[in-house]
Design a protein with these regions (language model features):
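C-terminal motif of bacterial Sec signal peptides marking the signal peptidase cleavage site
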Residues: 15-18
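Post-signal peptide N-terminal segment of mature Sec-exported envelope proteins
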Residues: 27-50
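Compact alpha-helical subdomains of small soluble proteins
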Residues: 53-109
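Hydrophobic alpha-helical segments
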Residues: 10, 43, 75-78
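Bacterial signal peptide processing site
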Residues: 20-23
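Bacterial N-terminal signal peptides that target proteins for export
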Residues: 1-8
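Non-membrane alpha-helical secondary structure
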Residues: 1, 35-38, 53, 57
Length: 109
């Protein structure tokens, strides 16, 4: 069980990290949809990654998602994104292309 949980979280956290296949996106979507604890872990890992980035990158993300650069940009972005993925508001294609729908969701609209 522990190995499955670790790999599930790794899959979910990888969603916002880069190249993701449609299959792995679907797997991660089901994980974060069905497990609030797994979603929170994925958000935490994602936020740490965003917050570890450069100040200019965080400022750019803050502008896009309409928050102050002094706020917890990573947590806001990742929470909105993973909630959108879990709810189905962000599809694989939206995610892959960073579509207007993806942007609306991470902006909190």
């Amino acid at each position: 069980m522990r190995i499955i949980t670790f790999s599930a979280l790794a899959c979910a956290a990888a969603i916002l990290a880069g190249c993701v296949t449609e299959r792995s996106y679907g797997q991660a979507q089901e994980i974060v949809r069905g497990s609030p604890a797994a979603r929170q872990d994925a958000i935490n890992k994602c936020a740490m990654g965003v917050n570890a980035g450069s100040a200019s990158r965080r400022a750019e993300i803050a502008r896009i998602i309409n928050v102050s650069p002094r706020s917890n940009v990573g947590r806001t972005y990742c929470t909105r994104a993973f909630n959108g993925i879990a709810s189905g508001r962000i599809t694989y294609e939206d995610f892959r292309k960073r579509s207007p729908q993806f942007i609306r969701v991470v902006q909190g609209r």
